[in-house]
Amino acid sequence: MFSFGRKSSEVRETLCDELKLIVDSAIQVYNFSMIEGHRDQETQDRYFAKGVTKVKWPNGKHNTYPSDAVDLWPYVTNLADIRVSSALSGHPDQIKALAKATGKTEKRIWELVLQEYATMKGVLMAFGKVHGVELRFGDDWDRDHDRLDQSFIDLPHVEVVR
């Protein structure tokens, strides 16, 4: 059984009840961190300017309060004591840093991260179904189970479909 750390607990407090229910259930069986829930206008504008998000304030699911979206990241167990940082969303520099720190190839780091992400996503999907909450993930915006047709991938992103 796992539990949320201080930062994840703070993020949890910004989430809508449906997301709280799902993450509270999921943490019982799978270890992950919550990176961000509610996003204020300044942060949303900054992310939009950097191309981190495609949605302007106030139209993002992170912009509601409580938030209808959360960014999550799995604890990558095969990377020894190195925890995938909250800043890692597939940025090449961070993949390179993890490869260097672990002595693994960048390709292997990606394989490990994507394997853990898929496991985490499956756990979240299962608890979404159990609790009757429809979710959308940042690797499959149109929810057709074809990740190759996406023009923007945001692996950490999970949102409630309303």
Which stretches of residues belong to each language-model region?
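Phosphate-binding glycine-rich loops and adjacent basic patches that engage nucleotide phosphates
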Residues: 6-9, 50-57
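Extended, low-complexity, intrinsically disordered C-terminal regulatory tails
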Residues: 23-54, 130, 138-140
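Intrinsically disordered, low-complexity boundary segments flanking structured domains
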Residues: 19-23, 34, 55-61, 125
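Active-site acidic/histidine clusters and adjacent loop/turn architecture
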Residues: 1-33, 116
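Catalytic cores and adjacent binding grooves of peptidoglycan-active enzymes
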Residues: 59-162
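Alpha-helix initiation and capping sites
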Residues: 13-20, 38-41, 66
